Amino acid sequence: MKRTLRNPGNSSTVGDVHDVFFEYDVSNVGRKRPRTKEEGYYESESEEDEDQILNKEKKEGQSEDMFSDTSEDEKRTLPNDEAQKRRDFIENGDAERLAHKGLRNKEVLNDDSDDEDDNGKYSKLRYEDIEGQEDTNQANDLDADEEGSEISVPSSPKRMSFNLKEDMEEGDFDENGNFIRKNYDPESQYDAWLNGSVSNKKSIAAAREAEQKRKEMENRRRNQELEEFSKLPFSTVPEALSFFIARMERDESILEFLQRQSGNKKSYKKKKNNTAEGISPERKSADAFRKKLIELITAGLTFLEDKIGKEDIYSETRESLQRIYQKLTSNSWSSPVSYDDSNSSQYNFKWEFDDKTYGPYTASQIQAWSNEGYFTDAKHAAFIQLANMDEWMYPNNICFCDVVSLKK
């Protein structure tokens, strides 16, 4: 019988062959039940017997986890050969070999945790007992791999080399080979004072002695500074400021002023003038005066740092010192000596390796020649002295407006 798709009610006989479209007939579609495959166990016409089917299932079951907990229902369904095989596997020590390769049994982990919680009491291993075990374990793993095992563990963790002596300093190994780190902190002795636990009488005495020595050194340094300050040509801060302002140029810092006083920019050719060293007496005298002047300047800077509390005094300019002077005295700074004073001191000058001395001249005349570069642009070095003094000086070391400081 054949039923058409357009008219399912009509049917016609077309031989004994069923039409393929018959199963798509809507009127004949009902609930489909899952079909049960009866292959393997109960098919009598199968070519495989029951023993061959069980062997096939054994091979498929080898991919499962051997260490998973097996319920009682599963144990009943397992064949006797499979259960016996698992018992033989554990008794032969294969599980222990896998544990060395990184697999840990759940029961072993629980036992280890119980040992660690036993009030921290454990048996320590000596260095001689531990040394060489790393190589032994690696050799055992290699032997096991060569013999071959029924279950292979891919991507097992690699062993990392370590320094046993350093580890023994940081902790100890118990009987099971577990490393237990020490709680001692070598830096804790430096932080003990934070907890108020410093009660050692010897340490307290040493700290008191160190504090006393520090105070003695501070007092000694202070007394030395006061002794140096007593030799200065000034005793107050305004006098010290006036000393520097009178010698500095416009927009010149103290550091630049100190460099200018330290040496001449131009080097002169030294000629031998009946002296063994080839240095004139005037130059020796000028060098000695320059050395005293540099010591006086540095002592004056220390005096200002101590009195006004400025640590960056070397960066101060002439104008900034004038502002400090005005703030302290409420008056603007003015030159202590006038160039036009007829009673001002007289100066002499001479050229190096020249026996003739020129002068005396007033301070205004010497200052005018110095500003024009008469002394600095000459072929030979020039030296200037006060008429009533024996010392010779370089032109850049003279302050024409503060003769009193130079005499000291």
Curated annotation (Swiss-Prot):
Q: Which GO terms describe its biological process?
A: spliceosomal tri-snRNP complex assembly
Superkingdom of this protein's organism: Eukaryota
Q: Which Pfam families match?
A: GYF
User: What's an example GO cellular component term for this entry?
Assistant: U5 snRNP
Basic and acidic residues composition-biased segments: 53-62, 73-109, 119-129
Q: Which residues form the signal peptide?
A: none
Per its record, how is this protein called by name?
Answer: LIN1-like protein
Q: Which organism is it from?
A: Schizosaccharomyces pombe (strain 972 / ATCC 24843)
